[in-house]
């Protein structure tokens, strides 16, 4: 086991504080409408330019191991805020730095760290409760646009795109962010259910100009096994041909003789058919086939429940208004499924989301909800260079997370005002002893830190503006973008309540642990030169033996 370096008391805390300040100072330059960019060197390719706090935090690794421990703990604050609300990482870092700096001063003055922490926790819990009281629901498209604009660093085009996307696919819908091909940002909305499986043969194409298969008012056959024998399909094909409608087959696979016969029949115009593979794998495939069945009022032909493909009738087939298939995707538009059954299925999947512990599973279940409930919107980010594309894409993703958080828990006045107002409402809070009171006071004082940093980044005098905002009431605050005082909500400067709450809770949690630190242990650095020297000498000895 490697030897350890151990530091105690003030020595440990000073080192830890240095690390906290180095990381927080790098992150906090990005805060606010006039925040600056940070350039991150990469081991290959062009450097990354970002205004995203968590991206900056993740890059920082310090040489001094004790300082690095402090930096890593604040990095944890930014990461947790990002995971919980998708935004507010810089605010969380600024709050953590303010609480740690104030707290360690009190510890150095001889205060009991545990009582300080209890006081901080008490203040934070009270402020969180007040934030909930100050919060108002985020319902209109205009409010969603404003939240998106603020989170995308005052880029109103991004705010508009997110508001349009939410309007089209609903607040529960899936909105994804992808690299665009041009200079302009675009919004693509896929209505209906789309899954990532294309046609099994290009001979099914009936719209050569777009290389797609389009079926109007088709029947849909859902089978959860491979189909290779055409005899199994004949009864269904005959029934569909008599009805004079096209047919889409969704199965685990269609191969060999079955696929060849379908292609020949389609080319001769005997029956209009297309075949695609079922989406997903294993249990997820079965679940998605069932989703499609409910959406189209069909039945999955499954041998597990004793159904045979040869005995399938037209009653077992689903129906939709239209189906479009290209080489990569199949889109089912306007399935004829019963609305009550679809909503029941959505509720069932939502229950699974609540119970799931895996982020990947949650994401896939959320996609299934969106496909059943309305559709999928894709925001394609346009930029002139790859460096700009990366930076812009990160901002759009931040804005998307922030708007989701706003819809979930509501909005409060932005620009650091909500924290100051919430702190002002609990100014009379008392602890059980004087040291807890000091903890409460320093936590409430730290609530000003985000506003002060926004103002400092705008090149203004933080103390003057913080004092003016504190003396104001309601949503009165300072718009650093226009350098004007006024009603923050009327000016469109909003923060999601969830983002502000998460930032404060995670900052206080980690800061409280750092204030109560008394000892730090790390490995002593290895002396690589000495090791190499010893190895070299050994080699020389071997040579001597040979002679």
Swiss-Prot record:
Q: Name one Pfam family in it.
A: Cpn60_TCP1
Please state where this protein is localized: Cytoplasm
The GO annotation for biological process reads:
protein refolding
Any S-S bridges, and between which cysteines? Answer: none
Reactions catalysed: ATP + H2O + a folded polypeptide = ADP + phosphate + an unfolded polypeptide
Name a single GO cellular component: cytoplasm
What InterPro entries does the entry give?
Chaperonin_Cpn60_CS, Cpn60/GroEL, Cpn60/GroEL/TCP-1, GroEL-like_apical_dom_sf, GROEL-like_equatorial_sf, TCP-1-like_intermed_sf
Recite the UniProt keywords alphabetically. ATP-binding, Chaperone, Cytoplasm, Isomerase, Nucleotide-binding
Q: Which residues bind ATP?
A: 30-33, 51, 87-91, 415, 495
**EC?**
5.6.1.7
Asked if the record carries the keyword Isomerase, the reply is yes
Where does the signal sequence lie? Answer: none
The enzyme's main class, written as a single word, is isomerase
One Gene Ontology molecular-function label: unfolded protein binding
Similarity annotation:
Belongs to the chaperonin (HSP60) family.
Q: What does this protein do?
A: Together with its co-chaperonin GroES, plays an essential role in assisting protein folding. The GroEL-GroES system forms a nano-cage that allows encapsulation of the non-native substrate proteins and provides a physical environment optimized to promote and accelerate protein folding.
Q: What is this protein called?
A: Chaperonin GroEL
Q: What organism is the protein native to? A: Aggregatibacter actinomycetemcomitans
Q: What is the lineage of its organism?
A: Bacteria, Pseudomonadati, Pseudomonadota, Gammaproteobacteria, Pasteurellales
């Amino acid at each position: 086991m490697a030897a350890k370096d151990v530091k105690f008391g003030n020595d440990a805390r000073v080192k830890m504080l240095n690390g906290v300040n180095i990381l927080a100072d790098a992150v906090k330059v990005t805060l606010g409408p006039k925040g600056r960019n940070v350039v991150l060197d990469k081991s290959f390719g062009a450097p990354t330019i970002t205004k995203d706090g968590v991206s900056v935090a993740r890059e920082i690794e310090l040489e001094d191991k004790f300082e690095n421990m402090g930096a890593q703990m604040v990095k944890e604050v930014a990461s947790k805020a990002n995971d919980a609300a998708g935004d507010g990482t810089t605010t969380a870092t600024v709050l953590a730095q303010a609480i740690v700096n104030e707290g360690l001063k009190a510890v150095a003055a001889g205060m009991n760290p545990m009582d300080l922490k209890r006081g901080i926790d008490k203040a934070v819990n009270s402020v969180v409760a007040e934030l909930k009281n100050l919060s108002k629901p985020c319902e209109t498209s205009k409010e969603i646009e404003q939240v998106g604009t603020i989170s995308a660093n005052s880029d109103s085009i991004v705010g508009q795109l997110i508001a349009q996307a939410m309007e089209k696919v609903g607040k529960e819908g899936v909105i994804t962010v992808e690299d665009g091909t041009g200079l302009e940002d675009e919004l693509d909305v896929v209505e209906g259910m789309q899954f990532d499986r294309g046609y099994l043969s290009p001979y099914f194409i009936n719209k050569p100009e777009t290389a797609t298969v389009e079926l109007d008012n088709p029947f849909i056959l859902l089978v959860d096994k491979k189909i290779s024998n055409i005899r199994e399909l004949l009864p269904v094909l005959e029934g569909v041909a008599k009805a004079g409608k096209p047919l889409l087959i969704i199965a685990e696979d269609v191969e060999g003789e079955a696929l060849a016969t379908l292609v020949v029949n389609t080319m001769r115009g005997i029956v209009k058919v297309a075949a695609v593979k079922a989406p997903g794998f294993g249990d997820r495939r079965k679940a998605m086939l069932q989703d499609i069945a409910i959406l189209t009022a069909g039945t999955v032909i499954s041998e597990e429940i004793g159904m045979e493909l040869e005995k399938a009738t037209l009653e077992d087939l689903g129906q939709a208004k239209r189906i479009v298939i290209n080489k990569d995707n199949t889109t089912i538009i306007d399935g004829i499924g019963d609305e009550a059954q679809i909503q029941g299925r959505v509720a069932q999947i939502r229950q699974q989301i609540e119970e799931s512990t895996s982020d990947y599973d949650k994401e896939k279940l959320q996609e299934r909800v969106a496909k059943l409930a309305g559709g999928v919107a894709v925001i394609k980010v346009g930029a002139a260079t790859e460096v700009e594309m990366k930076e812009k894409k990160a901002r759009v993703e931040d804005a998307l997370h922030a708007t989701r958080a706003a819809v979930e828990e509501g909005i409060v006045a932005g620009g650091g005002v909500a924290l100051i107002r919430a702190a002002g409402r609990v100014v009379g809070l008392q602890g059980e002893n004087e040291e807890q009171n000091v903890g409460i006071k320093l936590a409430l004082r730290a609530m000003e830190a985000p506003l002060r940093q926004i103002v400092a980044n705008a090149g203004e005098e933080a103390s003057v503006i913080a004092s003016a905002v504190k003396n104001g009431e309601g949503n009165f605050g300072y718009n650093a973008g226009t350098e004007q005082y006024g009603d923050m909500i009327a000016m469109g400067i909003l923060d999601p309540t969830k983002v502000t709450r998460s930032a404060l809770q995670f900052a206080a949690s980690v800061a409280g642990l750092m204030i109560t630190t008394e000892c730090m242990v790390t490995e002593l650095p290895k002396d690589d030169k000495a090791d190499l020297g010893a190895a070299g000498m050994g080699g020389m000895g071997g040579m001597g033996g040979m002679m």
